Every structure is written in C-alpha cells, then in structure tokens.
C-alpha cells in the first residue's frame, strides 16, 4: 500500500504472509559393527556385519509474517527515509516419528567363512554381495531396536528501525558532493523448544517388522537391496502408543539467543568530470547472548554473551574512459556474524575426573568473519553487447569451520576434546572474472532476438589453522577454483527464453569426518571432505501475457547430473546423491 500525502511526503505499508508444509520420508539402510577380512583392488571381504533399517516420517509447517511501514519526506532540504519492520518466523516440527529395526550380528563363525564382500570398482556406487546365510539373517523379519517421536518448535522474531537522510548541494575539494548518513537498529530473538523421546524397552523390541507393512523400495543401484522398510503411514497410526504421548519435556536442544545490532554510517558522493567517487564509513555495535542446557539438564544451565564493535570504511571509484568504457575500483571492509546455529549453546558435554570436559557444543566465543576486499574491473558497453574483466582479492580473518578440537577453552570451560565450530587464522581469496554478453541483432527477424552470454571465474583461496605441530593450510571452504556459465537465449516481444550450461570444479566441503574423531592435530587431505566437480544444463522460459500477467516455466538439471562427495581423493566415497530433474511453473500478476 502506497499513499502520497503531498508533493514531498509519501508513506507505505507492505505485508507478507507465507505458510507451507514440508513433508519428508527417509528410509535408511545402515550396515554396522563391521569387520573386514582380505582387501583386494576393488573389493574387501566381510567378516562381521549387522544391518539396521530405519524409517522416519516428518511433516514440518513453516510460517512467516512480515510487516514493513515506512515513509519519505523532506526536512530542511534533507531527503529523509524512515522504515520500521517486524517479522516472525516459525518452524513447527511436531509431527516426527522414527523406527529402527535391527538384525542379529553375524560373523565368520556363523557364515562358515566370509559373510560376503563389499565391492567398489566404481567409487561413486559401492555395492554389497552377501552369502545366502547372511541374506537370510540380515533381511529376516527384524525386531524393533528403538521407537522415537519428536516435537519441536523454533520461533524467530526480528524488529528493526532505520532512518536515512540525503542532501546534495555540498562542495568538497571544489567538487559537487552529496552527503548521506543514517542509523539502523535491529533486534532479533530466536528460541528453540525441541523434545524427543526414544523407547527401547522389552515391549517395543518385541515388535516385528512384519507388523508395520514392510515393502522393498525400487532402487537404481546395482548390488544394493533397499529394504524391506516399514510403511510410513503405519508409523503415524501408532504415534503415542509407546511414548505415552507428548506429555513430556526435555531441554537437550532448547536454546534462547538474542542479537542486537546498532549501526551508524556516513558517506559522500563526489561527481568529478569523468569520475564518480563514493567514500564512507560505517560503525556497527553488536551485543549477543545465548542460553542452553547441558545434555537437557534443566538444572545445568549454560549462558554466554559477547559484544564487539566493527568499523567499516569503504571507497568506490567509477572512472569513465569514454562513452563506452568504464573502470571501477573499490576497497572496503566487511563483516559476517556467526550464524545462530554455530554459536548457540546446544551442548552435550561431560566433566571428567580431572575437571576437564569432553563432548559437543556450539561456540559462543566465535569471532565474526571479517574481510578486507579489493575489486578492480574494466567494462565495455557496445551496441547490444557488454564485456567486463575484473580482479578481486579478499584478506579474511576468522573464517568459521566445523571441527573437533583438543585442549581448548570455550565459554570458560577447558576441553580435552570438543566437536564445535572454530575460527581459523588468516584466509586469502583472489581471482579473475570475465563476462561477455552479445545480442545477435544482426540476424534477420525473428532471429534478431537471440543472444549469447558467458561468465568465467578463476579463484584461488586458502585458509590456515595453527596446531601444536605447526600450521595446517587447506582450500577455502565452499570455494570452487573454476566456475563457468554459458547461456544462449531469445529475448524479444513477449518471450524470454534461456538455455544455460553451468559448471564448477571441486571444492572443500568440511574439515574431518565427525565419526572418526579427528582433531585439528590430525588434519590432512585424507580426512578432508570434498564436493566433486559438477555440470548441469537448465532451461528457463518466461512469457508476458500482458502488462500485468506473466508465466514462467523452468527445468533444472535436465541431464540428471548427480552430486558426489569424497574424502581426500575421488576413489574414497563419502556420499553420492541423485536429485533428478526439477520442473516448476509459476504465474506472476502485478497490480
């Protein structure tokens, strides 16, 4: 809603409401208690094995409400913008049920030799071959191992207020200058109330898989039988029968986190004959506090707080070489605060006899990610064409990684070993980017609407972490060295069509395998997880019916490319995912 009060003043109100259900069905096959025998080039013998078959059904309701009120006016020649906003988001995850069935453990004595073999000639699609005896035991009518039900509710509330004032007509260094300054305050609270109960008593463990309508799911990978698994609808039908219903509360994953941010800024825009210079400074003050419970014990409350101030100067220069060529340069400081999920005091820690601690916990002592950034580029604007080439560099402090650490202090407690999030030491990222766009308007109609677009980025990034025996250096997290995007499209009249080829090289996903209890002293390439290179083809179509109404149709990952994760080298599988091709259609109407 927009309203003009007079020639100088207007007000507006924006409202957003969004609600949707996210339903997930998870079937999991897990082979544990493993012991291998002889190991060959593409396989290894199985001398001991056990099978778990787990089914989880989850229905989560997400709801978002946002109100934004604001206005613009002139006050003594200053163009003034005022805005107030309030938002509320809720994740209601109160429909969660999980059952795990477990086989007996068998070994070479039971099987009369090896119980089978794993084969991994194709490292992306490993397989399993079992003897007939092993199949009869592992895929028999299994007993329930555990029944679990979850109820959780996460509430996220944010209130913000800002005021910005702008005025031109100033002179600095004999150059026309526009001055802008402002203030912003943001207060956010996030609360989590998560409850879970697991039942593994004799009555539950006497239940058989055959009582849950087991079925074998179709599965595309050779050497893998997927199931039998319980019918998820029968799980929901039995909710509350074994747990006694939702009349309980625990605090294991409960938390309350608050973050208040106050910011002031001042900037000036100077208009030279052939250049535009924008210089400014921003000061942000952050107050953070969080509360949680150790291992769900309401009498063992953990609290933490942190306050810090960040000063961010910036300088941006745009220089016009001629009517078609621009050189841009910028240097600035930037801040990224730790996410609540990394800093929350959700903890499962124990005190040892020597007074030290061990366990898993968020890290409220995390410092914010800080970066000094430099960009330099040249741009060319032709008739129906565009090209740019640029260099960028980032000097980063306090990059955040998940990691198991040893002999460290977090929130005033000394840990022999802790799975948490840590700040690394210095990180560096630099690279080059090339963009090219060309309309093919020299072609005859109707082909003059065709265009070609290309983007190529080459990046090098590293992080370092001090350990007792020196410094470990590794690639910057989630950063591919090579990324490219090539598109051919058609944009004319009512049609906007694009076919894109997107490619990226491997990148570091995270440090160390949680299950291997690798601490920072043991880091090497063999226990660092990487995401393999990926290429996909996407198609996008937009059609404008009239000035108000348009439709769109998208196809993503047309060739059904998988995602592959590995430890150190591509022949050591961590995870292999097939997502398929995604189709979407939408309608947009502008009032």
Regions from the PLM with identified roles:
Residues 1-35, 52, 60-70, 76, ...:
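Transmembrane beta-barrel wall of Gram-negative outer-membrane proteins
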Residues 7-8, 72, 76-81, 115, ...:
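Short loop/turn motifs that connect adjacent beta-strands in outer-membrane beta-barrel proteins
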Residues 17-21, 75, 86-92, 153, ...:
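Transmembrane beta-strands of outer-membrane beta-barrel pores
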Residues 44-48, 109-146, 193-254, 406-420, ...:
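Flexible glycine-rich, low-complexity coil/linker segments exposed to the extracellular/periplasmic environment
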Residues 49-66, 249-261, 306, 335-396, ...:
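Outer-membrane beta-barrel signature, preferentially recognizing the C-terminal barrel domain
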Residues 189-191, 287, 319, 323-374, ...:
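Surface-exposed extracellular loop regions of Gram-negative outer-membrane beta-barrel proteins
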Residues 393-396, 405-407, 411-513:
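Gram-negative outer-membrane beta-barrel transporters
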Residues 450, 503-518, 542-591:
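C-terminal beta-signal and adjacent terminal beta-strands/loops
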């Amino acid at each position: 809603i927009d309203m003009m009060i007079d020639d100088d003043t207007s007000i507006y109100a924006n409202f957003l409401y969004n609600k949707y259900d996210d339903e997930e069905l998870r079937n999991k096959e897990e082979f544990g208690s493993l012991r291998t025998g002889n190991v060959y080039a593409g396989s290894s013998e199985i001398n001991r094995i056990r099978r778990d078959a787990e089914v989880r059904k989850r229905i989560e309701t997400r709801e978002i409400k946002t109100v934004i009120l604001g206005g613009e006016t002139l006050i003594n020649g200053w163009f003034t913008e005022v805005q107030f906003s309030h938002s509320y988001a809720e994740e209601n995850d109160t429909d969660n049920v999980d059952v795990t069935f477990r086989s007996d453990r068998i070994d070479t004595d039971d099987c009369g030799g090896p119980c089978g073999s794993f084969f991994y000639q194709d490292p992306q699609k490993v397989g399993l071959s079992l003897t007939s005896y092993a199949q009869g035991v592992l895929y028999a009518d299994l007993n329930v191992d555990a029944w679990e039900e979850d109820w959780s509710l996460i509430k996220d509330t944010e209130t913000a207020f800002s005021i910005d004032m702008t005025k031109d007509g100033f002179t600095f260094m004999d150059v026309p200058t526009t001055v802008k300054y402002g203030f912003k305050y943001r207060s956010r609270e996030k609360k989590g109330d998560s409850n879970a109960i697991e039942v593994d008593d004799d009555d539950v463990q006497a239940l058989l898989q055959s009582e849950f309508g087991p079925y074998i799911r179709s599965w595309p990978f050779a050497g893998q039988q997927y199931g039998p698994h319980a019918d998820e609808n029968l799980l929901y039908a039995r909710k509350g029968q074994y747990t006694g219903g939702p009349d309980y509360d625990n605090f294991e994953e409960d938390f309350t986190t608050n973050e208040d941010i106050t910011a002031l800024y001042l900037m000036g825009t100077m208009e030279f004959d052939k250049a535009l210079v924008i210089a400014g400074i921003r000061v942000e003050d952050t107050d953070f506090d969080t509360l949680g419970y150790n291992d769900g014990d309401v009498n063992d409350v953990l609290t933490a707080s942190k306050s810090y101030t960040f000063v961010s100067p910036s300088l941006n220069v745009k220089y016009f070489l001629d009517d078609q060529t621009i050189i841009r340069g910028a240097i600035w400081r930037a801040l990224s605060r730790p996410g609540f999920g990394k800093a929350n005091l959700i903890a499962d820690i124990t005190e040892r006899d020597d007074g030290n601690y061990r366990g898993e916990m968020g890290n409220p002592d995390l410092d914010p990610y800080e970066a000094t950034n430099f960009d330099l580029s040249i741009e060319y604007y032709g008739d129906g064409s565009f090209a740019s080439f640029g260099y960028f560099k980032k000097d980063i402090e306090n990059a955040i990684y998940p990691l198991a650490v040893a002999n460290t202090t977090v929130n005033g407690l000394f840990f022999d070993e802790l799975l948490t999030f840590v700040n690394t030491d210095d990180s560096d990222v630099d690279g080059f980017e090339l963009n090219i766009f060309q309309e093919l308007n020299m072609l005859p109609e109707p082909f003059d609407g065709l265009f070609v677009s290309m983007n190529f980025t080459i990046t090098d990034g590293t992080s370092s972490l001090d350990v007792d025996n020196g410094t470990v250096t590794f690639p910057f997290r989630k950063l591919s060295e090579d990324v490219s995007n090539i598109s051919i499209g058609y944009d004319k009249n009512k049609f906007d069509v694009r076919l894109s080829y997107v490619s990226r090289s491997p990148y570091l996903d995270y440090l160390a395998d949680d299950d291997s209890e690798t601490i920072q002293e043991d880091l090497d390439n063999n226990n660092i997880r990487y995401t393999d290179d990926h290429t996909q083809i996407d198609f996008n179509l937009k059609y404008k019916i009239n000035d108000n109404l348009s439709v769109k149709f998208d196809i993503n990952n047309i060739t059904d490319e998988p995602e592959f994760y590995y430890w150190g080298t591509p022949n050591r599988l961590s995870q292999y995912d097939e997502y398929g091709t995604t189709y979407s259609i939408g309608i947009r109407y502008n009032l």
